[in-house]
């Protein structure tokens, strides 16, 4: 009987992460981590695991620590929106209005747009090349034409 516990644990026990899959790879991004001093830290990395190739999660640094952010993927690229961020690991948490992109093939990050409102808790989805950013704290939905970013940053068929 399957116990429901994955056999390859992630490197850090953290909560409030955002996760997405691209092909056979799982990305677990940001979140909160409680260190040995019992302090809560916003995580500035993501962990990556190819379920068919990797035996251990690899760690990828993010440009800023993030938690409660939205994430989605298209054409092999990861897109992030909103959430709380901190530029220094022990700095102040701030609402974030960035929409950014990560290319796993090149390990490069790009800022592609900004939401009108700074959003502390968000979800992100893409439908027909339009990104929808859902604000869970203020109840707004913002939409952005994602096609320019998709054309510029990915190896999409467009």
From Swiss-Prot:
Organism domain of life: Viruses
Family in the record: Belongs to the poxviruses Kelch family.
UniProt entry tagged with the keyword Repeat: yes
Coiled coil: none
Record key words, sorted: Kelch repeat, Repeat
Kelch repeat segments: 25-76, 77-129
InterPro entries: Kelch-typ_b-propeller (IPR015915)
Protein name per the record: Kelch repeat protein B10
């Amino acid at each position: 009987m399957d116990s429901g516990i994955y056999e390859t644990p992630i490197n850090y026990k953290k909560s409030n992460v955002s996760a997405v899959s691209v092909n056979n790879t799982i990305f677990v991004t940001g979140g909160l981590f409680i260190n040995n001093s019992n302090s809560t830290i916003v995580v500035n990395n993501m962990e990556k695991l190819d379920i068919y190739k990797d035996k251990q999660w690899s760690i990828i640094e993010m440009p800023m620590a993030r938690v409660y952010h939205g994430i989605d993927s298209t054409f092999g690229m990861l897109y992030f929106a909103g959430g709380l961020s901190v530029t220094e690991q022990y700095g102040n948490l701030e609402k974030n209005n960035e929409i950014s992109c990560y290319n796993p093939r090149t390990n490069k990050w790009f800022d592609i747009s900004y939401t009108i409102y700074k959003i502390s808790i968000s979800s992100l989805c893409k439908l027909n090349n339009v990104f929808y950013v859902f604000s869970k704290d203020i109840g707004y939905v913002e939409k952005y034409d994602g096609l320019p970013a998709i054309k510029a940053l990915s190896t999409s068929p467009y």
